[in-house]
């Protein structure tokens, strides 16, 4: 016979007071600070030689204990159907290098379950990035919800594990990893479709690409030169007839050659100066 009951959300299963208590646990100033300092949520984590292996839980220990206690108290009195689960739809990591491309080294990044002593990658979701591949975006999708329990002396939850390999001679920071995720907590759990870990290589940012127009410094110099010329040649009750000079002549910068047949080859169009280091 098919199930005829109704599925209730966490808010419906618990009273308004307990729901507010859960909100305070998750979004209190202390909890937000712990998420930043202990989990590096949205912060840049530096991979150094003295920190070759980094294990960052997705929930701080204090917050984990309070959430587990909240669900357990509701479960013990029959208000909740379980002792609570942690759900993370996706973990996204932005990885950038902080050394030159010829440095020989790599990073191994994966999602693990702290309930596993071996800290093995969940469902084989693991990504290796060589130094010359960076920058890159990496994503992980757990296939199950993690019970809010304690295993031995470990608070069980998902964790991002980063391993640094190689980089001989580089003792400082060789890569920066910024991880983002959104943890959810519920009294019900589920299993999810297995999706391989995602790895997207990103083109390095070309910061000179947008420098196609004169900078503020160039415009200021041009305006100052024009003001000086005007004060020297201004005659009372006389018509001003000055030969306008192009910006490239005033700044003594050669203009790039115009493409043959393009509109920029027209004599009536003003020359555009080359941009060098922001000028």
Curated annotation (Swiss-Prot):
Stretch list, region Disordered: 246-279
Keyword Transport among record annotations: yes
InterPro entries for the chain: MPV (IPR000603)
Cited Pfam families: 3A
Keyword presence, Lipoprotein: no
Low complexity bias locations: 254-268
Protein localization: Host cell junction, Host plasmodesma
Keyword terms: Host cell junction, Transport, Viral movement protein
GO cellular component: host cell plasmodesma
Similarity comment: Belongs to the cucumovirus movement protein family.
Role: Transports viral genome to neighboring plant cells directly through plasmosdesmata, without any budding. The movement protein allows efficient cell to cell propagation, by bypassing the host cell wall barrier. Acts by forming a tubular structure at the host plasmodesmata, enlarging it enough to allow free passage of virion capsids.
Full protein name: Movement protein
Source organism of this protein record: Cucumber mosaic virus (strain CS)
Lineage: Viruses, Riboviria, Orthornavirae, Kitrinoviricota, Alsuviricetes
């Amino acid at each position: 016979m098919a199930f005829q009951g109704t599925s209730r959300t966490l808010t419906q299963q618990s009273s308004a007071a307990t729901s507010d208590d859960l909100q305070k646990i998750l979004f209190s100033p202390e909890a937000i600070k712990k998420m930043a300092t202990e989990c590096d949520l949205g912060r840049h984590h530096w991979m150094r030689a003295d920190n070759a292996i980094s294990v960052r839980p997705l929930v701080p220990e204090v917050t984990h204990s309070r959430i587990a206690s909240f669900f357990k108290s509701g479960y013990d009195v029959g208000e909740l159907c379980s002792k609570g689960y942690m759900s993370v739809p996706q973990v996204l990591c932005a990885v950038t290098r902080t050394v030159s491309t010829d440095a020989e080294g790599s990073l191994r990044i994966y999602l693990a379950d702290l309930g596993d002593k071996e800290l093995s990658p969940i469902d084989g979701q693991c990504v290796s990035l060589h130094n010359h591949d960076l920058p890159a975006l990496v994503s992980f999708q757990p296939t199950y919800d993690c019970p809010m329990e304690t295993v031995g002396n470990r608070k069980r939850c998902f964790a991002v594990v980063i391993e640094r390999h190689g980089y001989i001679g580089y003792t400082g920071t060789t890569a920066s990893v910024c991880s983002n995720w959104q943890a959810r907590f519920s009294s019900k759990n589920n299993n999810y479709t297995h999706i391989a870990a995602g790895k997207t290589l990103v083109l390095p940012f070309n910061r000179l690409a947008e420098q196609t127009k004169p900078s503020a410094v160039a415009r200021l110099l041009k305006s100052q030169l024009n003001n000086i010329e005007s004060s020297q040649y201004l005659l009372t009750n006389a018509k001003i007839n000055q030969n306008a000079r192009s910006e490239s002549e005033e700044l003594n910068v050669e203009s790039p050659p115009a493409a043959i047949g393009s509109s920029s080859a027209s004599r009536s169009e003003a020359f555009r100066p080359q941009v060098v280091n922001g000028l």
